[in-house]
Amino acid sequence: MHTKALEGDWIMSFLETHKDSFVHLHLHTQYSLLDGAIRLKDLIKRAQELGVPAIAQTDHGNMFGAIDFYTQCNAAGIKPILGSEIYFTPGSRFEKGALKKQKVVGSQDEQESRHQIHHLILLCKNETGYQNLCKLLSRA
């Protein structure tokens, strides 16, 4: 049997077996500019087909679609988990040169280095968490 078919069969089998307990906690939608492709309507429809109990929306550095996502999930009987994927770096954005480059570990190129930019997924546990995340994103 072809390897890709085995992988696909395994994934579908896993999802079918665990559909009531599997939740995507890192998902970009149309609101992750240049990165997310799925439209909310299509996401909700597919989630209903798979029978997932909840979905997180973690678009890059924004919550532009949070209200629409929350409303559509609730209407479909899916628990919405609001969040965002943020970036953080050492230093302050107000300090010139604060964004330092760091050598890439394991790189063959002695000159290769990358900015120290890290990604972090933040999920809202409740309304207070939502308010805090909104404040954080507004200040960033």
Residue map of PLM features:
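Phosphodiester-processing cores and adjacent nucleic acid-binding clamps
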Residues: 2-140
